[in-house]
């Protein structure tokens, strides 16, 4: 029944948006009294958290599979592009799930700790690819632009937790590049390419390679 509740909630999010998610509406769709649904999800936020965790786990699994399917010998750029392309394909197939986790925050909702590890899965794949690229000599770690000290401090914490051995310069490029990947996906899904780019597949393929080279070259 938990899966049926979440499926009904996902349909409601697709129809009216996450901010309008209602346990009463979900219970009506399933023919349940609302008090019965509360035994599974005590609040709207609890149900919303379950949907968010599922979405992050789904896109994380997609990224992990894409990485695993490209031999390390093919190099950094091929692996990065494969993961970026797989994440975009998932987003195109599941636009409402993508919007739930990468779109505008839901007013009044504060994500609990339960969402942190699922949310990190895609980022950890990207950082692993970058670490391997550094070790293989595919990424030039030299810096050509001074970095503000506060940024060094923040990146040091990230490196210690998730990217040992990756220099601040390369971490900064990685954050910028992955932001560009998600930005390209969002521009496509939210209609901002309308009237500008017709061939979304070709455009994203180009963007994926450009973001890889943003990381590999100083």
Mark where each language-model region is.
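Helix-turn-helix
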Residues: 4, 8, 16-46, 50
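Alpha-helical structural segments
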Residues: 4-11, 46-66, 82-89, 100, ...
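Charged/polar positions within long, soluble alpha-helices
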Residues: 64, 92-100, 186-189, 216
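Helix-loop segments that flank and shape redox-cofactor active sites
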Residues: 65-74, 106-109
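Internal hydrophobic scaffold segments of catalytic domains
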Residues: 81-140, 200, 204
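C-terminal peripheral helix-coil segments that are non-catalytic and often amphipathic
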Residues: 124-218
């Amino acid at each position: 029944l938990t899966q049926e509740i979440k499926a009904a909630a996902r349909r409601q999010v697709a129809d009216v948006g996450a901010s309008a998610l209602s346990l009463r509406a979900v219970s009506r769709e399933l023919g349940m009294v609302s008090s019965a649904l509360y035994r599974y999800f005590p609040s709207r936020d609890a149900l919303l958290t379950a949907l968010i965790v599922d979405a992050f786990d789904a896109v994380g699994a997609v990224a992990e599979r894409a990485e695993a399917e490209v031999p390390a010998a093919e190099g950094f750029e091929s692996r990065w592009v494969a993961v970026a392309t797989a994440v975009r394909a998932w987003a195109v197939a599941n636009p409402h799930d993508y919007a739930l986790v990468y779109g505008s925050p839901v007013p009044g909702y504060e994500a609990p700790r339960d969402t942190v590890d699922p949310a990190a899965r895609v980022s950890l794949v990207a950082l692993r690819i970058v670490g391997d690229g550094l070790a293989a000599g595919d990424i030039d770690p030299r810096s050509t632009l001074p970095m503000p000290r506060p940024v060094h401090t923040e990146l040091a914490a990230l490196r210690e937790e998730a990217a040992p051995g990756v220099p601040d310069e390369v971490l900064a490029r990685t954050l910028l590049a992955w932001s560009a990947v998600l930005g390209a996906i969002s521009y496509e899904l939210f209609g901002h390419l309308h009237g500008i780019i017709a061939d979304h597949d070709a455009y994203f393929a180009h963007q994926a390679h450009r973001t890889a080279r943003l990381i590999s070259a100083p």
